[in-house]
Amino acid sequence: MRLHVLCLVFAAMIFAGCETMTGYSPGAGGYDSVPDGEKAQATFSGGDGSSIQQAVIIADATEKTGVRAEYIWLHERYPGYRLRFQGLRHEAGRVYDEMRIVAADGKSHTIFFDITPFFGKLR
């Protein structure tokens, strides 16, 4: 039960763009606001994010740098995207961030990030 509540609180803070938790909030209206050339303070591995099985794994990060890394990854691949939804999913003992975006060309995408390596690590 406590984990469920923690997940809901974390998701609410992300939706609200809480800068004290993540160090980042999406631009107004969910529009991409990452400056060109910003480098992630994390490492990426895994797949292309098109499914949970192909999730982008974010490692070597805290919650602050890991969440920021998600937005940087999206900016690098979908410049000018608009975030429509962000939520947590728990499957097979791992934690995923599901992000639904609309790319600048108008196409919708759902991207999965495996955030297990940094989930709950504030420092």
Q: What is each model feature region?
A:
Residues 1-7:
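Bacterial N-terminal signal peptides that target proteins for export
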Residues 14-17:
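C-terminal motif of bacterial Sec signal peptides marking the signal peptidase cleavage site
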Residues 26-48:
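Post-signal peptide N-terminal segment of mature Sec-exported envelope proteins
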